[in-house]
């Protein structure tokens, strides 16, 4: 039985979807599938198992910031050739742009098409094209697909992300991280990881930091914001305007998240839209909790007062209060982190994620797909 599966996304730059595709591809190889990954090349390509074929698509323009019709048409031609040459049986697309691309290629070549929906959105519904079967990363996303996009319940499968846990650093390794980042030992670190884009709403985080500074509540506290994106210059200016430059450090998106999380006391997620963020699982895997905005599927992992702290989106005052509470109560941080790790181990492991996705593929191979 041919188990060649084309995993299609727009780019291999650092981000949750690229991470998801890489993890999925690597896990499928271990289980006897033959995944092929197709996307615009980027740093995350290096994380792919050496057995996995990679197809570089011109989806992103040379400046790496936008997509074009020329790139779409060129990618379409390349994918048709790859599908024929590699005898692909299933196209599994991620993100709306490549959902459309995958849909057209699948119909042209009479292939099965699966898509994964990673986020909550309401705009451009008329140009959203999902697969015969759509995998939803959270229950909230599943409900959105059925309610807002007219997907049939039997055609939407909810599968949580799963990751390999981060490694816990020893004291010597943590000291080395402090030294590498030029941070004084004993400084409390609060980490925020994700792209510097509108949906992640770091503006609210920086304003919350400004509130804490005015109250005199963040002496010996450093906020490490890791990520790249279009808002970086604006956020750097906001940091200066809020006079919190001594309390904020920006780190590139290619920086070591595992190392940062090992030295952080806890994390903050200030997004206004999310499906189910990888960073919450990564932190939980080593017992570090999040203060997170109650959006999308976040509350499916962050249970307020149990596995983390939930705050309303776009509310700097509430976010500042939550940060202050955890700074003042390290024992609460430890309890939240322990519970977060337990939830991770129960529901969000790598093996569960790979096995459940593999079952969806096998349904297509055996003619028992969920698609109508």
PLM features per residue range, with description:
Residues 253, 272:
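Aromatic "clamp/platform" in nucleotide-sugar-dependent glycosyltransferases that forms part
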Residues 7-15, 19-71:
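N-terminal strand-loop element at the rim of the active site
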Residues 18-23, 188, 192-214, 223, ...:
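A conserved mid-protein helix/loop that constitutes part of the nucleotide-sugar donor-binding site
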Residues 143-147, 154-155, 162-180, 186, ...:
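Acidic anion/phosphate-binding donor-loop and adjacent secondary structure
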Residues 93-99, 117:
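Short His-centered aromatic/hydrophobic patch
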Residues 304-305, 309-316, 325-330:
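Conserved acidic donor-binding segment of nucleotide-sugar-dependent glycosyltransferases
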Residues 318, 325, 332-362:
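A short, well-ordered alpha-helix in the C-terminal region of glycosyltransferases
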Residues 289-292, 302:
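Short hydrophobic beta-strand element within catalytic cores of glycosyltransferases
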């Amino acid at each position: 039985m041919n188990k060649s599966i084309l995993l299609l996304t727009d780019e291999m730059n650092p981000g949750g979807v690229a991470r998801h595709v890489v993890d999925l591809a690597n896990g499928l190889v271990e289980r006897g599938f033959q995944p092929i990954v197709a996307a615009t090349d980027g740093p995350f390509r290096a994380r792919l198992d050496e057995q996995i074929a990679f197809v570089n698509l011109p989806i992103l323009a040379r400046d790496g910031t936008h997509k074009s019709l020329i790139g779409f048409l060129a990618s379409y031609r390349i994918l048709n050739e790859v599908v024929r040459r590699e005898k692909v049986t299933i196209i599994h697309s991620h993100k709306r742009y490549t959902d459309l691309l995958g849909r057209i290629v699948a119909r042209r070549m009479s292939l099965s098409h699966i898509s994964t929906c990673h986020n909550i959105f309401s705009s451009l519904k008329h140009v959203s094209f999902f697969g015969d079967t759509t995998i939803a990363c959270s229950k909230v996303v599943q409900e959105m697909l059925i309610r807002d996009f007219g997907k049939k319940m039997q055609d939407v499968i909810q599968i949580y992300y799963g990751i390999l846990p981060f490694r816990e650093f020893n004291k010597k390794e943590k000291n080395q991280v402090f030294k590498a980042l030029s941070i004084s030992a004993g400084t409390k670190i609060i980490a925020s990881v994700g792209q510097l884009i509108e949906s992640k709403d770091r503006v609210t985080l920086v304003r919350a930091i400004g509130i804490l500074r005015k109250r005199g509540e963040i002496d010996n506290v450093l906020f490490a914001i890791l990520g790249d994106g279009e808002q970086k210059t604006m956020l750097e200016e906001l940091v200066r305007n809020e006079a919190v430059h001594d309390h904020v450090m920006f780190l590139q998106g290619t920086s070591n998240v595992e190392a940062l999380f090992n030295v952080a006391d806890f994390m903050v997620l200030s997004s206004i839209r999310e499906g189910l963020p990888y960073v919450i699982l990564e932190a939980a895997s080593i017992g570090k909790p999040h203060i997170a905005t109650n959006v999308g599927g976040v509350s499916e992992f962050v249970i307020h007062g149990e596995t983390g702290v939930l705050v309303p989106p776009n509310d700097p005052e509430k976010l500042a209060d939550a940060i202050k509470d955890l700074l003042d109560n390290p024992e609460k941080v430890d309890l939240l982190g322990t519970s977060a790790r337990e939830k991770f181990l129960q529901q969000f492991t790598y093996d569960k994620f790979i096995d459940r996705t593999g079952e969806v593929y096998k349904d297509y191979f055996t003619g028992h797909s969920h698609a109508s």
